[in-house]
Amino acid sequence: MKFELDTTDGRARRGRLIFDRGTVETPAFMPVGTYGTVKGMTPEEVRATGADILLGNTFHLWLRPGEEIMRKHGDLHDFMNWQRPILTDSGGFQVFSLGDIRKITEEGVHFRSPINGEKIFLDPEKSMQIQDSLGSDVVMIFDECTPYPATHDEARKSMQMSLRWAKRSRDEFDRLENPNSLFGIIQGGVFEDLRDESVKGLLDIGFDGYAVGGLAVGEPKADMHRILEHVCPQIPADKPRYLMGVGKPEDLVEGVRRGVDMFDCVMPTRNARNGHLFTSEGVIKIRNARHRDDTATLDPKCDCYTCKNYSRAYLYHLDRCNEILGARLNTIHNLRYYQMLMEGLRGAIETGTLDAFVKEFYTSFGREVPELIV
């Protein structure tokens, strides 16, 4: 992977990630394909929304279908027929989400399979091996996602173990002679001194890119913004910056303003299945009865297949009847909305008009622009 930085506007960055399987324009949003599919979508449909790269889930793909079946197909690209870049998370966040059915030790994590209750062990070495079998273009280190709230001491212990796991991930990745890219994950909760220690430790190990983890786990938005403003300038300018698991459209805007290059989130797809649709004027809840006879399109500014062909009344009807097509059309729209937002942000950075773009974005929702600390 090669990262090219073209231009900046304030702290916002316009660039691209160049892989053997294709180029990803940044800032970029990655749709989430947890089980090797963006729910309800074919790869061609996902690509048509403007997506350059997908995120796959190491933890779930390890449990089903497993490494053996994956290797029989070649890798995840061949298995799901997506011949463009794929980033896979390490499984750390999913283990974090298991709560009481997992036990974290220095060696790794013991837990019971959420599928059949089988006892399973996952550690940094195994995570690297699984991601190697997936053929991931971007591999994420195995880390512990620091919970929120956490005391300074709890966050420190978690972050320092993640640093030790980062070194083990790096060593195993190198032992496997994996030709792809490995990203480190910055932890430390909401504590700036711990984030500093994490950044320094990861830079000493050396990675191809750096993610900011442990955010969007319940902390106030002000804390997320503060940590991003503190951490992003410490990441070398020639390395991509990835904000994991984020988020709402305004979170992407605020992340870009603070220098983030990459995002992922299940929100556009999950919300689509629940009838929450993002538009240039705010969220439309298509299940609201007011849309029963509404002949308007979802968003006159959107060029997606759904907006070009169907009315709000039709989408309301499909949802009321629990038709699969409704969820698919909603997903196409939400994914395209996110990609159009990223296209707009990239264009604004290129032309030096990001402030105006951000102001218009918030004005359309009747909201004030959040202040940057610096």
Curated annotation (Swiss-Prot):
Cofactors: Zn(2+)
InterPro entries (UniProt xref) = ArchSynthase1/Queuine_TRR, TGT, TGT-like_sf, tRNA_ribo_trans-like
Q: Quaternary structure per UniProt? A: Homodimer. Within each dimer, one monomer is responsible for RNA recognition and catalysis, while the other monomer binds to the replacement base PreQ1.
Q: Which organism is it from?
A: Shewanella frigidimarina (strain NCIMB 400)
Q: In which pathway does it act?
A: tRNA modification; tRNA-queuosine biosynthesis
Q: Which domain of life is it from?
A: Bacteria
Keywords for this protein: Glycosyltransferase, Metal-binding, Queuosine biosynthesis, Transferase, tRNA processing, Zinc
Record: active site: 89, 264
Enzyme class label: transferase
| One cellular-component annotation, GO | cytosol
Q: Quote the protein name from its UniProt record.
A: Queuine tRNA-ribosyltransferase
